[in-house]
A protein has these predicted regions:
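Gly/Thr-rich phosphate-binding beta-strand-loop-beta motif of the actin/hexokinase/Hsp70
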Residues: 1-24, 143-168
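Nucleotide/phosphate-binding catalytic cleft detector across ATP-hydrolyzing
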Residues: 1-4, 58-145, 166, 170-171, ...
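Glycine-rich phosphate-binding loops at beta-strand->alpha-helix junctions
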Residues: 240-259
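Active-site nucleophile and cofactor-binding loops and adjacent substrate-binding regions
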Residues: 83, 122-131, 149-153, 267-275
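Adenine-nucleotide phosphate-binding core of ATP-dependent small-molecule kinases
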Residues: 196-240
Length: 300
């Protein structure tokens, strides 16, 4: 039995490879009940689980898929950064760590990752659950060259060639999401004037700040996501690849039609369990002896 854990913006999702699923809203998670919730919600006993594929926050403190017992500070450089801290993901991580259940921690994509050197310009590219989502595409859609765009509270895109992650464009860099987005000129002025912190500016930098109609919001999301995807196609061309397009996130189905029109191709929408399932698949393959997952080394 293998479990994957997707530390999402709104909820933490758990999935097994035999399609057991559990979603816990981050605001409702209490560390003392996590193990019970997992066992009851997934109908299993943790003592019989071979390995858990765990994700947490930015994942910028590690570069390898690492045995949880070897990880310090939950695999991050520092607490805080881009996004609102709630504590649910921390409770899940700590509960699993204290339970002594065997677990690996997935890294995020950042400037110390094994990616194209040009994509290391920005300090952070994608959180660890995007690695799980990419592995899901590689494993279950059998695609070796693709671009993954996750459109939800924020928008993050990731490029893969020959089953290796080449780099990612983080939520704070380019396309906005529904609630979060990059800092524009006005946001920088607001931060400099003391009106808000940079994190607050990012956390409120999505399309909701514009009070758009649903039609205009979808149109804007689709356009910016398409531009971000096209930017990563430029990277793939350097590797003689043309990537298939996969969409994740809560807004994926809503933007698909317009996004496909912009790109002149058809994308595939992934469901909300794909990242957790991909993390479980990584756990299974690491358990089976894999030393490299999509260009990321394993230290198990």
């Amino acid at each position: 039995m293998f479990i994957g854990v997707d530390h999402g913006t709104q909820a933490v999702r758990f999935a097994t490879l035999d399609k057991r699923k559990l979603e816990l809203p981050r605001e409702n998670i209490v560390e003392s009940s996590v193990v019970h919730d997992m066992e009851e919600g997934l109908n299993l006993k943790l003592e019989f689980v071979k390995l858990i594929g765990l994700t947490y926050s930015m994942g910028d403190g590690i570069t390898k898929i690492t045995n949880a017992k070897k990880v310090r500070n939950r695999g991050i450089k520092a607490v805080g950064g881009a996004g609102r801290y709630i504590g649910g993901g921390t409770a899940v991580y700590d509960a699993i760590h204290k339970s002594d259940a065997p677990a690996i921690v997935l890294p995020g994509i950042h400037d110390e990752s094994n990616v194209d050197f040009r994509m290391k310009f920005f300090s952070h590219g994608a959180s660890p659950e995007k690695v799980g989502l990419a592995y899901y595409v590689s494993k279950y859609h059998k695609d070796r060259d693709f671009i993954l765009c996750d459109v939800s509270s924020n928008t993050v895109s990731l490029a893969v060639a020959e089953s290796r992650i080449l780099g990612a464009i983080d939520a704070a860099i380019f396309a906005p999401g529904v609630t979060q987005g990059p800092l524009d000129l006005q946001a920088i002025r607001d931060v400099d004037s003391g009106l808000m912190t940079a994190n607050e500016a990012f956390s409120s930098g999505g399309l909701l700040k514009r009070s758009l109609s649903e039609h205009d919001m979808i149109a804007t999301l689709a356009l910016h996501a398409a531009m971000e995807i096209n930017a990563l196609q430029v990277l793939l061309r350097d590797y003689s690849a043309q990537g298939s397009i996969f969409l994740g996130g809560s807004a994926a189905a809503k933007v698909k039609v317009l996004l496909d029109e912009h790109l002149g191709t058809s994308s595939t929408v992934l469901d909300q369990w794909s990242a957790a399932t991909g993390c479980a698949a990584i756990a299974k393959d690491v358990w089976g002896g894999a030393l490299d997952i999509m260009g990321i080394q394993v230290d198990f």
